[in-house]
């Protein structure tokens, strides 16, 4: 009977854990440098969108993940900047029981995927408060971005090994 309890306890310890501890806005900025005259121009926006993540271990099995979103909208005809919106949506997560690749996937895909709806809503609200037409960011496939990143890493590693072999000969 006690062996079964030990086996169950050992199995529970090995189970992967991903828990949200806190989600918060770390930084936010909205600039509309050409108001009010921008509204007198024809609204043909050109949208620039950048997305990145930062990860910091803040304790045992505790990680802060920051999703950085930057949106810059200019008018096609004049090139004038309509607005710049920057959001750093962050969260602290308890993560344990994962191997290296699984941990990387969790930190760069799963956690940002949880943060994105909050960031998207904040961007939409800021643009709305600037009295610009609605901006609804499309969903982001963080899994595809992770696979793309891993493929780039593998290609770079293969290239480095190839260069090392060529210098040896």
Curated annotation (Swiss-Prot):
SUPFAM superfamilies named among the record's database cross-references: SecB-like
Q: Does the keyword ATP-binding apply?
A: no
Give UniProt keywords alphabetically. Chaperone, Cytoplasm, Protein transport, Translocation, Transport
Pfam families for this protein? SecB
Q: Which GO terms describe its molecular function?
A: unfolded protein binding
Where it mainly occurs, coarsely classed, is cytoplasm
List the GO terms this entry assigns under cellular component, sorted alphabetically.
Answer: cytoplasm
What job does this protein perform?
A: One of the proteins required for the normal export of preproteins out of the cell cytoplasm. It is a molecular chaperone that binds to a subset of precursor proteins, maintaining them in a translocation-competent state. It also specifically binds to its receptor SecA.
Q: Spell out the PANTHER family in the cross-references.
A: PROTEIN-EXPORT PROTEIN SECB (PTHR36918:SF1), PTHR36918
Binding partners and assembly? Homotetramer, a dimer of dimers. One homotetramer interacts with 1 SecA dimer.
Could you tell me what this protein is called?
Protein-export protein SecB
């Amino acid at each position: 009977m006690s062996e079964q309890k030990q086996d169950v306890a050992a199995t529970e310890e090995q189970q992967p854990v991903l828990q949200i501890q806190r989600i918060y806005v770390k930084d936010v900025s909205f600039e509309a440098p050409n108001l009010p005259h921008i509204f007198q121009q024809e609204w043909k926006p050109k949208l620039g969108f950048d997305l990145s993540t930062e990860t910091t271990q803040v304790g045992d099995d505790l990680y802060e993940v920051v999703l950085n979103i930057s949106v810059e909208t200019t008018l096609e005809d004049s090139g004038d900047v309509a607005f710049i919106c920057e959001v750093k949506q962050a969260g602290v997560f308890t993560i344990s029981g994962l191997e290296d690749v699984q941990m990387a996937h969790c930190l760069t895909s799963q956690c940002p995927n949880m943060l994105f709806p909050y960031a998207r809503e904040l961007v939409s609200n800021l643009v709305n408060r600037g009295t610009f037409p609605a901006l609804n960011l499309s969903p982001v496939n963080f899994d595809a971005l992770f696979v793309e990143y891993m493929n780039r890493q593998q290609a770079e590693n293969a290239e480095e090994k190839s260069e090392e072999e060529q210098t040896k000969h």
